Amino acid sequence: MTEINFRNAQFLISAPSLRECPAEEGAEVAFAGRSNAGKSSAINCLTNNGKLARTSKTPGRTQLINFFSLGQGAQQRLVDLPGYGYAKVPLATKREWQAHLSEYLYKRKCLRGLVLLMDIRHPMQEFDTMMLNWAVDANMPVHLLLTKSDKLKRGAANNTLLQVNRSLKESGVQDLVSAQIFSSLKNVGVQQLEQVITGWLNLPAGEDEASVKN
């Protein structure tokens, strides 16, 4: 397995739709979540670059599909998808974002996995479930990142993780979906996230993690 130095990450391009995305070459992992779930902060924490992905206290500022290369040739990429569900924008705009997200998940052939971020205090909201269902329907590996774990005591955070994993097992998707606790503020869970993404980016084209395990 090829090791990845996430600190080499650099901004590549912003795309308003799938047509403007980089060429279907190499492999990429996407980050998705509600507008206040901490996507940009997680990417900045993972890459140890506080200025890589734009962060804002105003939810919904990420309205484009933002790509970051992880090395020369941009053959491995991280993707920051538009936040959903919380942003105070017109309904028509929300629907347009949802259409772009759905199109990206179903049609982007070089996408190897989806990191789905949820505030650990409010996991599995309506839009989270919608995104998870889209990914599962597309047979896309998903890693749930329960963010802002520093807002809870360790026992409460672990209990939430246990409940989420139980829900995944009851839904029968545990082979395709995993979960972990994460805090960009305290650097909790960074190494585990690195391992998951590295594994995905090393998957051969056309294979998912479940098929490799089997």
Curated annotation (Swiss-Prot):
Tell me which UniProt keywords the record has, alphabetically: Cell cycle, Cell division, GTP-binding, Magnesium, Metal-binding, Nucleotide-binding, Septation
Query: Which residues make up the binding site for Mg(2+)?
Result: S40, T62
Which Gene Ontology molecular-function terms are recorded?
Answer: GTP binding; metal ion binding
What biological-process terms (Gene Ontology) are attached? division septum assembly
Task: Give yes or no: UniProt keyword Metal-binding.
Answer: yes
Instruction: Provide the disulphide bond pattern.
Output: none
Write out the residues that bind GTP: 33-40, 60-64, 80-83, 147-150, 182-184
- Please state every residue range assigned to the domain named EngB-type G: 25-203
Superkingdom of this protein's organism = Bacteria
Whether Cell cycle counts among this entry's keywords is: yes
Give a single Pfam family match.
MMR_HSR1
What's the cofactor? Mg(2+)
Q: Which family does it belong to?
A: Belongs to the TRAFAC class TrmE-Era-EngA-EngB-Septin-like GTPase superfamily. EngB GTPase family.
Q: What does this protein do?
A: Necessary for normal cell division and for the maintenance of normal septation.
Protein name, UniProt field: Probable GTP-binding protein EngB
Q: Name the source organism.
A: Teredinibacter turnerae (strain ATCC 39867 / T7901)
